[in-house]
Every structure is written in structure tokens, then in C-alpha cells.
């Protein structure tokens, strides 16, 4: 049994969310997995995500490769088509304990390979970010947006 390896690409929110996912994965007992938290802000960011996934597969041939983050949210079919990728998880799903519970060795074969919901259907505040509300600064999940449906959000 080995703890999951996490690779974070992109913004500070991704770094914060990677730490939250690390806790969720540990609590669920996920092992022998590599999680890539991607960025989609530019085409170059998506290209680097694919490059990182290929490198991680070479370095970890027996691990389950799980791709999440904004690039996985916006291009799930692209990442699902990569032979190196075992699972694609959307931005909403990556923060749900049930998603990580389904990634344990005894359940991994019984879960959907691609779990990406429409982010515009999200109607609740990201619970893992609420701790930051009492401070002067907080992280805002641009990829999930808000209920105002601005065109700024992905």
C-alpha cells in the first residue's frame, strides 16, 4: 500500500484543492494512485497537463492515474481518450468524499471511468473553502462560478 502521489498544475486554488483532495483520499484509503490536478487557462496549460500525465504513467506504470481540475472539466473526452488515464473526475466531484471512497482498490472497477458533471448546475458553496471566509482573503472557485452565471467563468 502506498499513499497517492499528487501533481498540481496551475493556480493557487489548485494547490489548495490538492491538499483538500490529499485529505479526502487518505480518509478514503486510496492507495497506489497518481492524481493530476490540471489547469485549462491556456492551450499550453492543457498541453503541459498531457505531458505530465504521460511522464507520470512512465514513472508509475502500476498506479491508477486520476485526472481532475479545470482541463479535465472542460475536456473530459480528451483525457479519457488518453491510454495513460484510468479515471477523469470533474471539479465538483473531486471535492466529494464519496468520489474518493469509490477509488479504493475494492471499488475502482465498479465506478464510472469519467465522472464530470456540468459545472453550471452546481448550486452550493464549496464547503472546503468556507474556512477562508473569516479572513480578509479567501479563495474563489472561478471554475464553479456563482449563481449569477457570468461569462467570466469557465
PLM ranges: what are they?
Residues 1-154:
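Proteins enriched for Cys/Gly/acidic motifs involved in redox and nucleic-acid/cofactor modification
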